[in-house]
């Protein structure tokens, strides 16, 4: 019988109940937009990674909205078998060390290598670019141990049996193969951005998190740490950012074709970037209701 309670909103709930859910969602201390098409209501929550572990924000409003939604969408996830995990453990050194006894100085420009060494206080490193980028981002305030927004929501959907699914699934063996075989040169933009974030310092990283909580979207996207998180993401390193955009645009269109309320936890940059999801929806005549996601136009000087 418990399975029948959560999905009932779309079919039986009066409009005032739906409006109450939307009002609850608007209290979320995170970037959130409401989009409607006919009988469909889509609540887009823009998430960022690396939030401080001890950061306080109103998770109760988000969980309440998720509890009463008809369905929830999560970011793309990878699903690995025990064999995949075993392979990763077996080749752990490949994941964490540069190949053939090389160091970072063999791949980075002299100027970038000097910046990295100044930040880490060490000479050329044999750590892989994946490990080095993570170390630099932590110097910029990125918290790898923090709980992601999607993880918080996923727990809520399991507790209340709200229908939920990722917008896409990666096979574990394909994911691991790409990570293990990607040449270090593919990480150069990532290392440059991560070094810039580290140079900005943990205070700038903390301000990014605060701007996210206060829904200051342009400031979040312009922060060095957010740019580094984007440049060092799987999708950027593997040159598959366009694939991610396609996946999310398809998922959003599908959600807006279904009756009821859908809550989607999506990458903030993908939503708010120029020609991103929000721009596309607006161009199609829909009205994303929420914080302004575009930078303010420069003020015209008086003549």
Predicted region positions:
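Sec-dependent N-terminal signal peptides
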Residues: 1-3
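N-terminal signal peptide c-region/cleavage motif recognized by signal peptidases
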Residues: 5-7
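Structured, acidic catalytic/metal-binding patches in enzyme active sites
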Residues: 15-236
């Amino acid at each position: 019988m418990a399975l029948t309670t959560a999905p009932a909103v779309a079919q039986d709930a009066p409009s005032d109940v739906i409006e109450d859910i939307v009002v609850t969602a608007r209290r979320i201390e995170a970037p959130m937009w409401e989009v409607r098409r006919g009988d469909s209501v889509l609540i887009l929550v823009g998430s960022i990674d690396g939030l401080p572990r001890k950061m306080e924000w109103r998770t109760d409003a988000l969980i309440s909205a998720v509890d009463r939604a008809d369905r929830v969408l999560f970011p793309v996830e990878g699903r690995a078998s025990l064999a995949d995990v075993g392979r990763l453990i077996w080749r752990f050194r490949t994941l964490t060390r540069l190949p053939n006894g090389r160091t970072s100085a063999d791949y980075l420009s002299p100027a970038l290598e000097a910046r990295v060494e100044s930040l880490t206080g060490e000479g050329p490193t044999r750590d892989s670019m994946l490990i080095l980028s993570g170390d630099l981002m932590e110097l910029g305030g990125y918290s790898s141990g923090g709980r992601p927004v999607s993880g918080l929501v996923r727990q809520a959907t399991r507790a209340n049996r709200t229908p939920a699914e990722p917008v896409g699934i990666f096979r574990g063996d394909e994911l691991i193969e790409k990570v293990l075989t990607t040449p270090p040169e593919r990480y150069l933009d990532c290392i440059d951005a991560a070094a810039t974030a580290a140079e900005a310092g943990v205070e700038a990283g903390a301000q990014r998190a605060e701007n996210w909580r206060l829904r200051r979207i342009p400031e979040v996207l312009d922060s060095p740490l957010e740019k580094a998180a984007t440049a060092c993401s799987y999708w950027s390193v593997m040159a598959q950012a366009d694939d991610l955009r396609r996946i999310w645009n398809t998922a959003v269109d599908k959600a807006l074709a279904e009756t009821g309320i859908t809550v989607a936890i999506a990458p903030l940059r993908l939503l708010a970037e120029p020609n991103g999801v929000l721009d596309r929806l607006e161009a199609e005549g829909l009205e994303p209701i929420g914080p302004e996601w575009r930078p303010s136009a420069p003020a015209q000087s008086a003549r």
